[in-house]
């Protein structure tokens, strides 16, 4: 009896340690790449967001190919229709985020990302028939209220930036839902899914990127005059992006898309503070800070409300469950937050 309890405690402690390590990995890489990209675009004028994203996935493809060659990534299957659908959502997500970062202040960029929580909840209601309690719904409304306060008062908001942020939010929510969906449906690990998606994303973004960037900025990427410092930041951005891509898949695989977004309030605070520290007080005023605090309080409230009995219930599943998956799902239930 004592040995069984000890083994259970040890397993719980190990899971908690892995969850914390995965989350810290995501926090460090996500905050780092936002700040590096902002410096590369704002300070050194490399405004080619789509091409930059293609280079990110090109670097990720090189790593996954190398790991596959070494045998660390095992062969797996992902049907082309599902792969192409995921890549479509993911490309719109990444391009939208990069363009939003270029056209908006760091503050509005990160605050807009907060709205991915209610969007992700809506997707779960529509696609997975999840039902939320009254407190959970009210917490989502509080998040929206905070975002609205920041949207109205942030002087750096413009129509193009707002539209880019809206596209980024919806496509990112769909992409994150699909990460969890595909990993579960096809029993794919984080590295396996990344090995399938990164080459297609790299090829499509590097093909479309230069033309889209020229349309957005009226500048040609091949005419950009690299300096030693800007080249260093470009290489640094590509290197960090590998960790960012991998950590996102790891975290969403261990948690869920909504929980992954709820935990994001720590990254929100870090990015806002570091953004205002390194890039000036652009768009910062009392109302923006108030809106930020309201939104973050709403996120914390959501985390508490949804974790209570009846706070978030799944009435049915959108993914067919086979007999072989039932056993694995029993084990996976211990891994989800």
Curated annotation (Swiss-Prot):
A Pfam family of this chain: TPT
Alphabetized UniProt keyword annotations: Antiport, Golgi apparatus, Membrane, Phosphoprotein, Sugar transport, Transmembrane, Transmembrane helix, Transport
Topology relative to the membrane: Multi-pass membrane protein
Region Disordered: start-end pairs: 307-337
Residue ranges, compositional bias (Polar residues): 319-330
GO cellular component: a single term: Golgi membrane
Protein name: UDP-rhamnose/UDP-galactose transporter 4
Naturally occurring in which organism (per UniProt): Arabidopsis thaliana (Mouse-ear cress)
Gene: URGT4
